[in-house]
Amino acid sequence: DAGTVYGDSIIGTLGIYDSRQYDGTFADGSSRAANHDLCDHVLSSICNDIRTLYEPKWTRRGMWDSRYFEAWSPRVPAMLLELLSHENFADMRYGLDPRFHFTVGRSVYKGILKFLSDQYGYDYVVQPLPVEHFAAVLNDKRQVELSWQPVDDPLEPTAKAEKYIVYKRVGNGSFDNGTVVKKTRCVMDVPADEVVSFKIAALNQGGESFPSEILSVGIASASTAKPVLVVNGFDRTGAPDDFRSNDDEQAGVLADDDNGVPYKQMISYVGKMKEFRRAIPWTDDDAAGYGDSYGNYEKLVIKGNTFDYPALHGQSILKAGYSFVSVSKAALADHAYMNADLYSAVDIILGKEKQSKMGRIGAVKGFDFKSFDQTMQQAITDYCKAGGRVFVSGSYVATDIFQNPLVKAEDADKKFAREILKYEWRDDKAACEGAIKTVASPLTEERADYSYYNKPNEESYVVESPDAIVPADPAAYTCFRYSENNLPAGV
């Protein structure tokens, strides 16, 4: 309850410690002045990292030597951390973003680590960041070849990967305990007619990184056809869409437009924001004022981006009689994976990928998670011109190119959509009831109904406002429509 202010002002981070209780000593007789040092390390780590990566105007509110129970009662080094004001719009634009969560959690860890290093005179090593540019393909011996790249931490020179753990999962089972390797490439045997999945973690003396996305392969033993390449293009996590009125009197998050993408799952979501007037004060918990939300999701753990979609698509590909491999979107910059001589088709998973901001526009970061970046556009163009076949699925395949409210549309992007993928934007927020149907077309004469997740749930990320798209070529045709209004859902 640190308060709310207008504009883009950040209330920021406060640390609280106690140095005077128990005659100023811990149980072992050492000075409680160490609490000050711990607090300073953690606050410095948080504020430096946030200012460098996201928001140069992030406020360090200071440190209080105060008799808060949680600060004075422990007889070991302790501090209280008030990271931000959950009432303040400018703070919470960052506070709702999973990337911010990761950075701050890592900052706290680094602050504690450096405090212990100072206390005991040891050198420290920070655990590595997750690897990127992951790819899982099959070689001529029908073995899987895994490759990836380490990621250096610009904020911490000790956080370099020394080794890696390769985790494997067969079918719908659990991941094994992992195999340690020293290089950024690994070859393994895989059983046929099973979806086999992998994830990578980096290792050093400081510990183990967060895992990579999950990529999968499958060998259809009876198939003589070329395999299908699956591109895992959905790597977005982020806060909900937000707005601020021109007069600054209203601001908040737009759950019906895009409620954000949690990292794997979210336990803290209670419901949509319903009070946007910034002047409305808190009265009591039944009239919570600005930022008040519904409570209909208090008991639900909301699913976000699991980073595990090639396995899901691969099950269907394998069932259809094709082998498949998968690569990350970033890996397309390293190798010409989209090769019509090697793959019978390419399945591009985009999910809720779209150009998104972090907090205040113009702070440090630009826009991340473009659905079709230049590398992908070129790879798809070359593949299609060589006779390749492409299947693309995603909520914002047109809006991100034609009508993203954050970014000016580029003529080259629109030309790519129209001339290579043969579709055009018709509408955003095209449907809300979660149902589509097939229509008579060269694809199929069969009538079928399908559903998608249109509300927060425990099974899948939610699709709040999918696109309507129309053919942009005389040879193209509509094959799906939204059941509620007949707007075109697929081309």
What are these regions (language model features)?
Residues 266-409:
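Helical hinge/lid and interdomain linker segments adjacent to catalytic or ligand-binding clefts
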Residues 3-6, 54-121:
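Active-site-adjacent mobile loop/cap segments within catalytic or ligand-binding domains
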Residues 187-208:
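Beta-strand-rich modules
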Residues 3-31, 360-365:
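A short, glycine/acidic-enriched catalytic loop
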Residues 115-158, 206-225:
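Pro/Thr/Ser/Gly-rich low-complexity, intrinsically disordered linker/stalk tracts
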Residues 353-465, 471-477, 483-484:
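A glycine-rich, often tryptophan-bearing local segment used as a flexible ligand/cofactor-contacting loop or short
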Residues 162-166:
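Short beta-strand elements bearing conserved aromatic residues within extracellular beta-rich modules
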Residues 176-183:
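Short beta-strand segments within Ig-like beta-sandwich modules, predominantly Fibronectin type-III
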